[in-house]
Amino acid sequence: MKNKTFIKNKTLFAASLALMMALPMQAQRFEDNFEDKTLRLDYIVAGDSVNQAIYFEQAYSNPTWAGRKTRLDEKFLNGNGQVTVYEHGTNKVLYVNTFSTLFQEWQLTQEAKHLQKSFESSFLVPFPKKPVDVS
């Protein structure tokens, strides 16, 4: 009985190893979708303790990308929001990152219960080579 268990575990291990080796081959390469530049997206976030609205302001190109170049479609931390870059037309996720803004912290204050305010916020994403959708 011990041999059968060993063979079963050995087969499971071999299958797991083959799967792990195949995964990196399917991972997207930074260079396929992005230039070594940064796309800075500026927004205004406005509202009060209950309501919030986000208004796109402008976009800038910065000369280099200082963010991660691997595992681009995975989020590593939880935040109050998420910026996602999709390939236009296919909705394939090319890049994802989470964030928390100063506005979201302010929403928890007493002042936010009786006053509306707006805050500037910027999101940095790798500069796409082709048209993308950002949400």
Indicate where each model-derived feature is located:
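Boundary at the C-terminal end of the N-terminal hydrophobic targeting segment
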Residues: 25-27
